[in-house]
């Protein structure tokens, strides 16, 4: 355990950030999974809707600093390729 006051505060803020980041990453996985499910069922409309939602969540995660912008770009590219292949 830290003895320095600022480090005690950082431990608390880091824990809050970790929980928030895990929640956002979980939402991302769910959104991407929805796109993949729609693609597997060959449902073009659902896949397009899910793609827009997933892209939006990826962009929000980048703006919150949860993931890097290149990581989001790669993920969006991958799911877009799957949807466009329908």
UniProtKB/Swiss-Prot annotation:
The keyword Metal-binding does not apply. Disulfide bonds: none annotated. Keywords: Ribonucleoprotein, Ribosomal protein, RNA-binding, rRNA-binding. InterPro entries: Ribosomal_bS20 (IPR002583), Ribosomal_bS20_sf (IPR036510). GO terms for molecular function: small ribosomal subunit rRNA binding; structural constituent of ribosome. Pfam families: Ribosomal_S20p. GO terms for cellular component: cytosol; small ribosomal subunit. GO terms for biological process: translation. SUPFAM superfamilies: Ribosomal protein S20 (SSF46992). Binds directly to 16S ribosomal RNA. Belongs to the bacterial ribosomal protein bS20 family. HAMAP family: Ribosomal_bS20. This is Small ribosomal subunit protein bS20. The gene is rpsT.
